[in-house]
Each structure stands twice: as structure tokens, then as C-alpha cells.
């Protein structure tokens, strides 16, 4: 789980541990990751924290080596880490440096992690890749705001489709999910964390032979 120390990522870690999964909680700040893991799993039986910066190839490679050395396997990858909800910007006035930073984290970040973990995923009997996207990445519903975030998430959706087609022969199911905005000061009246996490859990737990290459919310297709 990338970006697992807070918000929806943290809740997904909690729910996966309750379902019996062994969870690697990736966090840019290892101390915060270790604190989250301790709070979610005081006995340390199900959740282990790992330092991970998805925009840093060295960090991603170190994470993959650590996972292989400690667990020897990866069955599920949830790409949750993201950045730059630039609701103040429009496509006509966006700072392209900011756009590049968002793409590096929100698109290239998951891509790096997939490359690093793919050998272990290919060896799994039940491999899954879940890319946490957003309605902001839905081309069908885009308007004029948040260009960095929207374009990077639309790219993540495209990557989901490409990988689903390529990796079908390996039995790897690749899906994108839109968890919806959780309730917060920035988004009052949003979904509970449990509701938002449910879409991710669904994509993790679908059986072999299930759907791949989809973009869903609450297990229902969402407009591309």
C-alpha cells in the first residue's frame, strides 16, 4: 500500500489486516508510517511500515528489495499515494512545473512501483493491482479546474487499461477505483473513510477471472 499512513490509505490497511492480509504500509515519512502501523496493529502481526517515496526510483527499488527479503512475495499492490489537488488552477493558467510534479507522483509513481513489484506479482497465484484514481481523472466529467490532478489521474486510468491488456496472460487483474472524497475540512459532507475504502477493498478481493481494466466506484462502473 503506497501512501498508507493517513486517510483512505490508512483505512484500507486497517480493513485488509482485518481480512487476514499481511500489509506493507508505505509512507514517505517512515516515522509516521511506523506510528500508523502501531496504532492499527499494536501486536505487529499484520502490518509493517516501509519508507517509500514513489517519485524516487532509488526508494522504490529499496522498498521492493525489502519486501522480497522480508516476505518473499507480493500478491496485491494498491497504488494510493498522490499529490497536488490544485483546485485553484485552470488549464489556461496552470504552472507546468506543478503539472510535471503531479504527473511524477500520481502517474510515474505508480508506474515505478509496478515495475519494481511486477516480478513478484507474476509469481503470485492471486495477483492484483489496484490504482486509486479519482473522479477528477474522469475525462467524461472534467470541467476547468485542477488540471495537474485531473491530467495525472487520467493518465493513471490509461495506464490501468494498458496494463490490464498486457498482464491478462499472467492472470494479473488491474483495476482503477474512484473512492470518492472523504469527509474533511476541505470537503465537508464527504464520504466516511470506511465508505471510501470499500471501493479499494472490492478491487483487491475480486476472485480470479474477475473484471480487469475497469474504473469503478462502489463496485459500479464509473465514466472514463
Predicted regions mapped to residue ranges:
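Conserved glycine-rich Rossmann-like NAD(P)H-binding loop of the short-chain dehydrogenase/reductase
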Residues: 19-35
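A glycine-rich helix->loop->beta "capping" turn
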Residues: 45-46, 66-79, 85-87, 173, ...
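The beta1-alpha1 cofactor-binding region of Rossmann-like NAD(H)/NADP(H)-dependent oxidoreductases
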Residues: 30, 51-62
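Catalytic loop of short-chain dehydrogenase/reductase
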Residues: 83-103, 111, 122-169
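Canonical Rossmann dinucleotide-binding motif of NAD(H)/NADP(H)-dependent dehydrogenases/reductases
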Residues: 1-24
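Hydrophobic positions on the long internal alpha-helix
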Residues: 78, 113-117, 121, 159-160, ...
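C-terminal helical subdomain
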Residues: 169, 176-179, 184-224
